[in-house]
C-alpha cells in the first residue's frame, strides 16, 4: 500500500495544496515553519482523524480566517485506489467519506467519521498505534524505538489493555466483586427464607385453633338466633297492634273534638240568612251608576284629545313661519354653494401634483444638507500616504526577514550538527569507559590502555572545541532572533499603515461618488419642481378662495333639506287639525262647562259603597256554605266514631304483655351481639393470619426464585477468577510477547540482510528495556548502544518495519520527519545510504527535511516555502 496524493484545504498553514508522491523516495524540503510537517499531520488526520501534533481541539487545525478544513488522501492498495476525505471541525464529521476510484468514477464505500475509520481498518489493515509507533517517525526519533521497547510493544499489542483488564481495579475484578457481593446477598436470603418457613408453620397452627373456635360460636349463635327470630316475630305483631291502638284512640278523640266545634258553627244559621236578603236588594242600583260613569269618561278623553291637537296646531304654525325664512336664506346662498363645489373639484385634481411638489421640496432640502456635509468631509480629507511606496518598503522588509530566517536556520542546522557530534562523542567516551578487556567494541581490533587514553584525550579536546562553537552559534542565533523580532515589529507597523491608507483612499473615493450622485439628483429635482410650480401657485390661490367660501357653504348645508314641498305639507296638516278640533268640540258640547271630575268622584263613591255590600254578601254566602258542610261533617263523624269503637274492641291489645315481650327481645339481642363481637374478633385474627401466610408464601417463592441463580453466580465467579489468572504476564501476555518476538526477529534479520552491516544477526528481548543485541562475526553479543551511529539507525528503521510488518502483514510506506536533527555531516551521509538501502524493503519512503543534503537520497523532490501566512508547494524534479 502506497500514498499517491493528498489534497489539503485550509489545514494548518495550507490554503489549498495538492501534493503528489511519484517517486520511491519522496523528499519534502523547506525552511522551518514552511508547512512540511503539516503534510504529515494531514496524512495522519486522513487515516485516523487525529494529527501528530498536540492539538487540544480540531479548530486548532483549521487555518486562521477559515471556518472549515478538508483533507483528501489517495491510497493505492492491491491495485485499487481508495480516496479518504476528512473534514474539520466535528460538526462536519457526517461528511467524512471513503470511496473506491475506478476509471475516474468514485463509489462511496462508507460515510460518517466513525464508519469511515472502521472501514479503513477493515480494508487497509491500518492500526493507529502501530503506524505512529513504527513507520511514521517523528522529528529526530528514529532511535526512540530502542527506548522502553517492552512498553512500546505492549502498547502496540494492546497488552496494556489486557493488564488494565486484569488489574485489581479493572473491569474483571469489578465484576467478580459484584458477583461475590451478590453471592453473599443470596446467602443472607437463604437464611431469611428458612426464617419465613418457620413463621409460616407457626401461623398455620394458630389459624387452625381459630377455625375450631369459630365453629363452636356458629353452633351457639344458630341456637340463640332461632329463639330471637321467634320473639322478634311476636314483638312485630304486638308493635302493629300497639300502633293501631294508638291511632284509634287518637282518631276517636279528634272526632269528638271536631263535632263540638262544628255544632258551635251551626248555631248562627238563621240570623245570617235574614242579613243576606237585605243586602241583595241594595246591590241592584250599581249597573246604572257604571253606565253613567263610562259616558262621562269618554267625553273627558275627547276634550283632552282636542286640547292636544290645538298644541300640535300651534307648533305647526311656528314651524311653518321658520321654514319660510330658511328657504329665503337658502336661495340667497345658492350661488356661493355652487362656486365652492366647483373649486373643491379643481383642488382634488391638483392634490396629487401638490403632494409631489411638497415631497420634492422636502427631498431637495434634505439632499442639499447632505451634499454640504459630504463636501465638508471631502475638503477635510487629506490623502498623503503613497500605498505603492509602502508596498515596496514591505517587500524589502519581508526579503530581509526571509534572509534572516534562512541565516538562522543555517546556524540552527550547524548547531544541531555540533550537538549531535557532542552527543556522539559523549556516548563514545562512555562506551570506552565501559569496555572490559582490550578489544574495540566497534571494529573488534586490539585496544591498548595508551591507545584508549589517547582516544579519550582526543575526544575531550574535541568536546571543548565543539562546546566553544556551540556557545558562539547560540550567541549568533540570539542576535539574529533580536533582528527578526525588530523586523516583524516594523512589518506589522507598516502593514497597519498600509491598511489605514487603503481604507482612507476607499472612503475618499466613496465620498466623491456620493457628491456626484447627489448633485445629479438635486438638478433633476429642481427641474421637476420648476415644472410643478405653476400648479402649486394655482393650488394656493384656489385654497384661499375655498377658505373664504367655506362658511357660506356650511351655512347652505344647514338649509339643504328646506324645500317648498315641506312648507306645503305643513299647511295641509294645519287645515286637517283645525277641522278635527271643530268636530270633537261639537260632540262634547253638553259636558264642556261641567266639572266632570267631581261628577265621576261622586259616582265612584256610591259604587264603592255598593261594592262593600257585595263583599259582605259574598262573606255571608261563604259562611252559610260552611254551615251546610259542618252539618254534613257532624253526621259523618258520628258514623266514624261508631266504627272505630267496634274496631278497638276487636283489636284486643294488652300494653303490659307487650312490655314483657320487648324485654325478652333485648336480652336475646345482647347475647347475639356478644357472639358477633367474638366472631368479628376471631375473623379479624383469621384474616391477618391468612394474609401473613400468603405474604410468607410469596416471600418464600421470591427467595426461591432469587436463589435459583446462586449456583450460576458461583460458577461465573470461578470462571472469571480463572480468566484473570490466564491473563497474567506469565501466561497469555507471555505467549503473545513470545509469538511476536519470533515474528519480529525473523522479519528484522531478513530486512537487515539487505544492508551491508558487520554483524551476523540481531536478537530482541522484550523483557529488557534496552533489549536489542547484535552478534558480531566472532560471536560477540553487543548491546545496541555500543554500535556505531549508522548501525543503530539501520537497526532502528529495520525494527520499525519488522514490527509493522509482523502486525499488519504488509508495509507500503515509511515516513521520516526531520531525520537529520542532531546528526553531524558523517552521520547524515550514513543516513542517506541507509534510506537508499531501505528502498529494497519498503516501496515508498517520504522524507520531511530542511536539510539540502538529503536531496541526494530522493528521486522526487517537493519544495515548500512560506508566503505571508500560507504554505506554497513546488515540484522541483522527478529524476
From Swiss-Prot:
**Homology family:** Belongs to the SMC family. RAD50 subfamily.
Q: What phylogenetic lineage does the species belong to?
A: Archaea, Thermoproteota, Thermoprotei, Sulfolobales, Sulfolobaceae
Summarize where Zn(2+) binds, as residue positions: 440, 443
- Identify the residues that bind ATP: 32-38, 139, 786-791
| A biological process term (GO) from this entry | double-strand break repair
Induction is noted as: Part of the nurA-rad50-mre11-herA operon, these genes are cotranscribed.
Instruction: Tell me the InterPro entries matching this sequence.
Output: P-loop_NTPase (IPR027417), Rad50/SbcC_AAA (IPR038729), Rad50_ATPase_archaeal (IPR022982), Rad50_ATPase_DNA_repair (IPR054990), Zn_hook_RAD50 (IPR013134)
Q: Which UniProt keywords apply?
A: ATP-binding, Coiled coil, DNA damage, DNA repair, Hydrolase, Metal-binding, Nucleotide-binding, Zinc
What Pfam families is this protein classified in?
A: AAA_23 (PF13476), Rad50_zn_hook (PF04423)
Gene transcribed to yield this protein: rad50
Per the record's keyword annotation, is DNA repair included, yes or no? Answer: yes
PANTHER family registered for this protein in UniProt: ABC TRANSPORTER ABCH.3
Ranges for domain Zinc-hook: 394-492
Q: Which cofactor does it need?
A: Zn(2+)
The record describes how the cofactor is bound as: Binds 1 zinc ion per homodimer.
The keyword Lipoprotein is assigned to this record: no
Q: Which organism is it from?
A: Sulfurisphaera tokodaii (strain DSM 16993 / JCM 10545 / NBRC 100140 / 7)
* UniProt GO MF annotations: ATP binding; ATP hydrolysis activity; zinc ion binding
What name does the UniProt record give this protein? DNA double-strand break repair Rad50 ATPase
Amino acid at each position: 500500500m502506497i500514498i499517491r496524493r493528498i489534497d489539503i484545504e485550509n489545514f494548518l498553514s495550507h490554503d489549498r495544496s495538492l501534493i503528489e508522491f511519484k517517486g520511491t523516495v519522496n523528499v519534502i524540503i523547506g525552511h522551518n515553519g514552511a508547512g512540511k510537517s503539516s503534510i504529515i499531520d494531514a496524512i495522519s488526520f486522513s487515516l485516523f482523524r487525529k494529527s501528530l501534533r498536540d492539538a487540544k481541539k480540531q479548530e486548532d487545525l483549521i487555518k486562521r480566517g477559515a471556518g472549515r478544513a478538508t483533507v483528501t488522501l489517495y491510497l493505492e492498495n492491491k491495485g485499487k485506489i481508495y480516496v479518504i476525505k476528512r473534514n474539520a471541525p466535528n460538526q462536519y464529521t457526517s461528511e467524512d467519506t471513503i470511496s473506491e476510484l475506478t476509471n475516474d468514477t468514485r463509489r462511496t464505500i462508507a460515510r460518517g467519521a466513525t464508519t469511515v475509520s472502521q472501514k479503513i481498518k477493515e480494508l487497509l489493515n491500518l492500526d493507529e498505534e502501530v503506524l505512529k509507533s513504527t513507520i511514521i517517525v517523528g522529528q529526530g526519533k528514529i532511535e526512540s524505538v530502542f527506548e522502553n521497547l517492552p512498553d512500546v510493544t505492549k502498547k502496540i499489542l494492546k497488552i496494556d489493555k489486557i493488564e488494565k483488564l486484569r488489574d485489581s481495579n479493572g473491569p474483571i475484578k469489578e465484576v467478580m466483586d459484584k458477583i461475590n457481593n451478590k453471592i453473599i446477598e443470596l446467602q443472607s436470603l437463604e437464611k431469611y427464607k428458612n426464617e419465613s418457613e418457620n413463621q409460616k408453620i407457626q401461623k398455620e397452627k394458630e389459624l387452625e385453633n381459630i377455625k375450631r373456635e369459630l365453629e363452636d360460636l356458629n353452633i351457639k349463635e344458630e341456637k340463640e338466633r332461632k329463639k330471637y327470630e321467634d320473639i322478634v316475630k311476636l314483638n312485630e305483631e304486638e308493635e302493629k297492634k300497639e300502633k293501631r291502638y294508638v291511632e284509634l284512640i287518637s282518631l276517636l278523640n279528634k272526632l269528638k273534638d271536631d263535632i263540638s266545634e262544628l255544632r258551635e258553627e251551626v248555631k248562627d244559621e238563621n240570623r245570617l240568612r235574614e242579613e243576606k236578603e237585605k243586602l241583595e236588594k241594595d246591590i241592584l242600583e250599581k249597573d246604572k251608576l257604571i253606565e253613567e260613569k263610562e259616558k262621562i269618561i269618554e267625553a273627558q278623553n275627547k276634550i283632552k284629545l282636542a286640547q292636544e291637537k290645538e298644541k300640535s296646531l300651534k307648533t305647526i304654525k311656528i314651524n311653518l313661519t321658520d321654514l319660510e325664512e330658511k328657504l329665503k336664506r337658502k336661495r340667497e346662498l345658492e350661488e356661493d354653494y355652487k362656486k365652492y363645489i366647483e373649486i373643491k373639484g379643481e383642488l382634488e385634481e391638483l392634490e396629487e401634483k401638490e403632494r409631489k411638489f411638497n415631497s420634492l421640496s422636502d427631498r431637495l432640502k434634505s439632499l442639499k444638507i447632505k451634499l454640504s456635509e459630504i463636501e465638508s468631509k471631502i475638503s477635510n480629507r487629506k490623502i498623503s500616504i503613497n500605498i505603492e511606496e509602502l508596498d515596496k518598503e514591505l517587500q524589502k522588509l519581508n526579503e530581509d526577514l526571509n534572509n534572516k530566517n534562512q541565516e538562522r536556520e543555517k546556524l540552527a542546522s550547524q548547531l544541531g550538527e555540533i550537538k549531535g557530534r557532542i552527543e556522539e562523542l559523549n556516548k563514545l567516551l562512555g562506551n570506552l569507559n565501559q569496555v572490559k578487556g582490550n578489544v574495540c567494541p566497534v571494529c573488534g581490533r586490539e585496544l591498548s590502555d595508551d591507545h584508549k587514553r589517547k582516544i579519550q584525550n582526543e575526544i575531550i579536546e574535541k568536546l571543548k572545541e565543539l562546546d566553544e562553537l556551540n556557545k558562539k552559534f547560540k550567541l549568533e542565533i540570539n542576535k539574529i532572533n533580536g533582528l527578526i523580532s525588530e523586523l516583524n515589529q516594523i512589518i506589522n507597523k507598516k502593514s497597519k499603515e498600509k491598511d489605514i491608507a487603503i481604507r482612507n483612499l476607499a472612503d475618499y473615493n466613496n465620498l466623491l461618488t456620493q457628491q456626484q450622485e447627489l448633485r445629479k439628483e438635486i438638478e433633476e429635482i429642481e427641474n421637476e419642481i420648476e415644472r410643478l410650480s405653476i400648479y402649486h401657485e394655482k393650488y394656493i390661490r384656489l385654497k384661499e378662495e375655498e377658505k373664504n367660501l367655506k362658511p357660506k357653504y356650511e351655512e347652505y348645508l344647514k338649509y339643504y333639506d328646506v324645500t317648498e314641498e315641506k312648507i306645503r305639507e305643513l299647511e295641509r296638516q294645519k287645515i286637517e287639525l283645525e277641522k278635527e278640533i271643530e268636530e270633537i268640540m261639537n260632540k262634547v258640547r253638553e259636558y264642556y262647562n261641567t266639572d266632570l271630575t267631581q261628577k265621576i268622584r261622586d259616582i265612584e263613591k256610591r259604587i264603592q259603597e255598593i261594592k262593600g255590600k257585595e263583599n259582605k254578601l259574598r262573606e255571608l254566602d261563604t259562611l252559610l256554605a260552611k254551615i251546610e258542610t259542618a252539618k254534613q261533617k257532624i253526621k259523618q263523624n258520628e258514623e266514624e266514631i261508631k266504627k272505630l269503637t267496634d274496631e278497638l274492641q276487636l283489636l284486643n291489645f294488652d300494653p303490659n304483655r307487650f312490655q314483657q315481650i320487648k324485654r325478652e327481645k333485648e336480652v336475646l339481642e345482647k347475647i347475639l351481639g356478644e357472639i358477633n363481637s367474638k366472631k368479628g374478633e376471631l375473623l379479624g385474627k383469621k384474616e391477618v393470619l391468612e394474609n401473613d401466610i400468603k405474604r410468607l408464601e410469596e416471600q418464600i417463592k421470591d427467595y426461591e426464585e432469587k436463589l435459583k441463580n446462586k449456583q450460576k453466580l458461583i460458577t461465573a465467579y470461578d470462571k472469571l477468577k480463572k480468566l484473570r489468572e490466564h491473563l497474567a504476564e506469565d501466561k497469555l501476555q507471555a505467549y503473545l510477547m513470545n509469538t511476536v518476538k519470533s515474528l519480529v526477529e525473523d522479519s528484522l534479520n531478513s530486512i537487515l540482510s539487505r544492508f551491508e552491516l558487520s554483524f551476523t544477526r540481531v536478537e530482541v528481548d522484550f523483557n529488557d528495556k534496552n533489549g536489542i543485541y547484535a552478534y558480531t562475526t566472532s560471536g560477540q553479543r553487543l548491546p545496541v548502544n555500543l554500535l556505531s551511529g549508522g548501525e543503530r539507525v539501520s537497526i532502528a528503521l529495520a525494527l520499525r518495519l519488522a514490527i509493522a510488518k509482523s502486525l499488519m502483514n504488509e508495509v507500503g510506506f515509511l515516513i521520516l520527519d526531520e531525520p537529520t536533527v542532531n546528526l553531524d555531516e558523517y552521520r547524515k551521509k550514513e543516513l542517506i545510504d541507509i534510506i537508499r538501502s531501505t528502498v529494497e524493503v519498503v516501496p515508498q519512503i517520504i522524507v520531511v527535511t530542511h536539510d539540502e543534503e538529503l536531496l541526494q537520497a530522493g528521486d522526487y523532490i517537493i519544495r515548500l516555502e512560506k508566503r505571508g501566512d500560507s504554505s506554497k508547494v513546488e515540484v522541483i524534479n522527478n529524476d
